[in-house]
Amino acid sequence: MEKAKILLILTGGTICSFGDDKNENRDVQTKKAERLILKNFQESESPYREGDFDVEMILDILSENMTVGRWNRLIAFLKQTDLSEYRGVIIAHGTDTLAYTSSLLSLVLSGTAIPVFLVSSNLPLNNSQ
């Protein structure tokens, strides 16, 4: 089977964060998160675990710090990218503004022929739960 080409867009948020031992403090480390996300996915049982991932780090923030300018940066990236090259898009995003971003992208990406998923987490990546 041909490897599925998947676009992974990292924007920060808890899903791209690492916490202290008590998970009281977290620090967004999107570049470090990229390696761990891909490693964990490749070790999973997913049929796409050997997919061909293009990873783009668009933002490196907690989502409560999202602004119109940052949404525009994400939209501009998606509009200039040839999404027809991919089998799907995964956007890792924080939970605080996920609903707003998903609503915005449903309008911006209407008519897109491939699935676009937004994923988030309530716990940092290094939390064993």
Regions found by a protein language model. Name each.
Residues 1-129:
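Active-site histidine-anchored catalytic micro-motif
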